[in-house]
Amino acid sequence: MTVSHGGILEGSSRGGKMMDWLKNKKAISPILALLIVLGVTIVVGAVFYAWGSNLFGNSQEKTQAAVEGTATNMFYDAGAIRVAATCIDKIRYQDADDSDSWLGYPNGNGKIAKPSTSNGCYNSTYGTVFYDERFIVEIPVTIDTQDYKLTGVKVVGGIPKIVDMGGTYTNAFEDISAKFYAFWLHLNDNYQLLKKDGTLFVGYVNKSGMFEVSNGYVIAWNQTRDTYGKLASSVGATSDSSWDAVNTTTGVAPLVETSWPYYGTYCSNVKLYTATGEELKPGFGSGTLVAQWFCSSATYLDKLFNNPEYVVGTLPKNSEKTVKTYLFFNTLYLPNYKGSTNDGYVTFEVPLKVVSNEGVTKEVKVKFTVYDDE
């Protein structure tokens, strides 16, 4: 009884105290606070978890994209496309020094004249000339895209370097001036002059500059001896049979004409020769053989025709494209140009680079040797 009674009394006492405790607001606050804290913690944790998962996913995607982009560029650079360039490996001057009436000079006095600051040229007795050996080298560049579409493709020509030379030479070897030019449009075995944008040059080229006029003449070269005195109208070179003689007032020089003076103070500062086979076929000669260019400064040439970048554009997958580039040697002195034996030569190495909007960079180098057989 005592135990039971005591237990009942103690239980009743505790029940009353419980009711009092529940009614006590101060006692309820800590519990609610704990529950609120736990609830907020759970909610915030869930939010952070969701945000973190999304952030991690985005980071993975961005990282993966960056890696793929890098890998793609590396793959391109490692050889995703194929580029090849070839040209004539041996170029020989054909009767480039003396006794060459074929170039339009009198027998025994045929020289290739070199422009100078003093406007030097052959005089009335044909005895005074400056040596010059100019030429153009055609370098085709072939691009094979393999499995990739390329946009904004360009072929960029670099600066030629001398990698070897030999022969007797009496003077110090002089630097060359070689640039890529957008020159040629082939038509009926003739080459017509193109501007940088690929359109045909129509106008006049004379000793004071180059002038584009719609009623001018289409400049052409690589004519043969058979067209002595004029260019065939079938190639669009002239609208008349010939031009008048040089007009000393206006400075207009004949493209071709039959009464070219072999004497006087007229100088053709640009005479182009084109490499055909293993020989250097005259494309421009003095006198009436082919044509005359008059230009007092190379600035005019560069402004209109210097073109180190050949725009190719878009190339589809698994396609092959050949771009013809033209390297114009404005001034070149070969060993033996004043020597006594025919042993002069110079070997050049020319870099050409293919680039595109996708980050393609592929460079090839071409070598060729120029000989002086005189």
Swiss-Prot record:
Membrane topology of this protein: Single-pass membrane protein
InterPro entries found in the cross-reference section: Flagellin/pilin_N_arc
Annotated localization: Membrane
Transmembrane segments: 27-49
GO terms under cellular component: membrane
Keyword annotations: Membrane, Transmembrane, Transmembrane helix
Name of the protein described by the UniProt record: Uncharacterized protein MJ1403
Classification of source organism: Archaea, Methanobacteriati, Methanobacteriota, Methanomada group, Methanococci
